[in-house]
Amino acid sequence: MEQLLNITNEELPRETTAMARVFAAHVGKKSLSHQETMMRLTENLILARESGNSFITLEAEESAALLANPHFCRGEKALFHLEGSHLYLYREFHNEAALAEAIASKLQAPAPENAFSDAEIRAAFVKSGGPGTGKTTIIAALVTLEVKRNPGIVIEIAAPTGKAAELLTAGLAKACPEYPLKAETLHKLFKAQHGSGRFNCNGSNPLDCDLLIVDECSMISLDTAAKMFNGLKPGTRVVLSGDHRQLEAIGPGAVLDSLLTFDPGEREAARKLKKASTELTANYRSKLAPTIQELAKALREEDDVKLLTQRITNAASDHYCFKKSGKETHKEALESALSHWKKLPEVCAEITAGSRKQAFEMLKSFRIITASRVGQDGCIKFNEEIMKALDLDSPESPGSALLISQNCRRTALSNGDTGIVFTDSINGGVKVCFEHLEEPLSFHDLPPFESAFAMTVHKAQGSGFSEVFFPLPTKDTPLLTKELFYTALTRAAMKITISGTLEMVEAALMKKSCRSTALRKRILSQLEKADDEKKNL
């Protein structure tokens, strides 16, 4: 099937590859013309799914071809679901429909007694805002009010990745030290099964929680959001927080954006959703340097590509630098890396509390973030060059930085956690230290990992660094979007150097992410249905 679709096995996730093979077995029994039509639809759907879309839109003759074989697109055992001209994988359709019903149900729930604020009059509400707009402060205030009102309340706080959870925990510790709460990853909180991705907390075994607060929701895929809501008790209230202008989830769907993008012409039901949503715009306490703040604000609010390109390429300060890319790009990136990390191998010569703290501070002081993994401007290439420049022979060399790429409950490691390799002067050999773990780990205990000196913007999402070097690709790519550019810019707290051409900046700013999803439409339909039922009582 992979060969027929002109897609390599490596480009397909395991579940999609399996789906393609099952489908091939069915279409193999049909006529050649039918095979060609179905193969083309399958290829388009797989590629659309890999781009984050929940469905593809069919032409009339394509819909007719599917309807002529209803076992392909009707019923729970069908591979696909056809709704009008929209063709889904059945799983994506089910997730979208279930999530819409769950969110609408939360919005229809009665207000809690003695509500403190307008934000609390809904069982679920959404807030979005850029860095420094007060998202963590609002979460802290809500936690404080809820605990004072109901000391026995069970509150859970979560984020999609380990790094995002770690930063949220630290932020809440400062904002409300009297009520310390530890944020967990969604997969850990809902007890995800290793390998399958299923949550053990589900409709039959819901999470014991009265209030769930989830941060960095732009990173949550449709599949994860559906499983999360399915794993909640009917009375659990939900708060979703994030920045919907950042990159969307790697998987299909645009959950946060679907809840926050409003059309003035939308029907009455949209007002209920809008009332439950808040976009924070005022900047109260951003850790970002002024020039970075100003450019981030411009990216959020302006759509004039020419004007934005001029601002980005002409801005200059102690905190921001745009360099026209050339042969010196890699050399400049390596020079910056060495200025921050050249002593890292020396610091990692032994494991002490002081050396651990110093090593992680050094690592967080700088990062190279890239649009893609592969190619001359991909993170793999930069990592190879940095390892060589630091005289690190392998990932097991003291001073190497590792990025965990798979959740592992056994070791309490999550996708996105960063470790540093140290010499174990007591027992011999090397160990890997992680900030959130007291005891270092051996290499054989680690889940899959990669080098962490350079990472993709997707991997960096939810993290922050003092200084960032962001090399734009030399050729346009679908990955290069306005959302990716904005996310890269806001990873830097004190300084960012962007290396690229004016053409690549324009290419990024011209492409705004627009995923094919009907989640918002389904939520509004559910709300309208509930309103009609109330009127008929």
Task: Give each language-model segment a name.
Residues 1-62:
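Intrinsically disordered, low-complexity N-terminal extensions of AAA+/P-loop NTPases
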Residues 60-116:
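Interdomain "pre-motor" coupling segment immediately N-terminal to P-loop NTPase/helicase cores
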Residues 61, 99, 185, 215, ...:
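Residue-level signature of catalytic and energy-coupling elements of molecular machines
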Residues 119, 245-402, 408-411:
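Conserved helicase motor core of P-loop NTPases
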Residues 119-128:
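Conserved pre-motif I regulatory segment
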Residues 130-314:
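ASCE P-loop NTPase helicase motor core
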Residues 417-537:
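C-terminal accessory regions
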